[in-house]
Amino acid sequence: LDALAEQGIRLEDIDAFSGYCGAMGPTVGGIFAIDDTVCEHVMNAGVNHPAILGAPLLHAFAQATGKPAYAVNQPDTDELADVARITGWPGVYRKSHVHCLNQKECAIRCAAELGMGYEEGNFIVAHVGGGLSVACHEHGRMVDTNDVLEGAGPFAPNRSGDVPAKPVVKMAFSEGASKKQMDGIVGKTGGLLGLLGTDDARQIIERIENGDEWAATVYDAMAYQVAKYVAGFAAVVRGKVDGIVLTGGVSHDPRFVSYVTERVGWIAPVKVYAGDFEMDALAAGAIRALDGKESVMTYTGEPSWKGFACEGALPDVEG
C-alpha cells in the first residue's frame, strides 16, 4: 500500500486485483474469482511458501474496495491427458507442476502473432530459466508437460531432470546417500550447477567463449534435451503444431536459441519471448475478465484430476 501511495495511486482507483495464488491444488487453467473458499483452502493446505499469501491479500483488497480479485492460471494448474500420467512404476503417476502463468501467456502471445486464438491452435512452449518446463498446449489445455518439482524433463540450471533409475537406486541403498542429499540434487544442486559449479548461464557462456569445452558440451546437452522434448511433444498433437515458443531467461542467449531452433524449426515456426511475463500475464488475465473475453470460474476445492475412473486402475501411491 505504501508503494501505491508513493505513486499517487489509491486502492479505490484500481479496477481489479490479480495475483499469484499458491496452494489452490490442481485445477484447470483459467481465471478464478478469489473468495472465502479459496482463502480457507490455501491457508489450511499445509504449504509453507510465500505464494499462499496471494489469495488472502487479494481478497482483503477486494473486500475493502468492492472490486473483483482473480487468480490467473494458478501454479498448480493440471490439465494433463490421462495417457500422459501413466508411468511404468505401478502407482506412480505424473502430475503437472509447470511455469503455468508464463507458459500460457507466451502461448497466447504466439497465437495472436499467428493470427489465431489460443484455444484454436496447438503450441509447444519451453520455459528455460532457473527451472525448466516444456508443455504441449492443445486447444487451450496443457495436455502434457514435464514435472518441474518432481525431477522430470530436461535437466535445468539447478535441477537434475530425467536420469536413469538404477544408478539413483544404487546411490540411495549401496552408497548411503541421504534423502536430503538426493532431494537436493533433484531440485536445487543438480543440472548446470552440479555439473559446472554455477547455474548462471551468463557465466557459462563466458566460459564457453573462453574455450571451455566441458562447459560447451554440458550447456549444449541442456539445449539438446529441450529440443528432444519439444519434438516429442509434437507427436502428442499428431504433428499438427502451430507454433513453438522459447521463453525464460536462458532464451536471451543466441547460442541456446539457435541450437534448439535448428533441431525443431522444421516442425513449426519458433517464436522467442525471452524472459518471463508473469506480471503481464496477471494484468492481461484481469483485463480479459473485466472485458468479458474470458469466463471467471468459481473455485470449489475439487481437484481437476481425482485418479483414473476405469476399473482396474491402481491407486496413486501419494494418495
Task: Give the location of each predicted region.
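Glycine-rich phosphate-binding loops at beta-strand->alpha-helix junctions
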Residues: 241-260
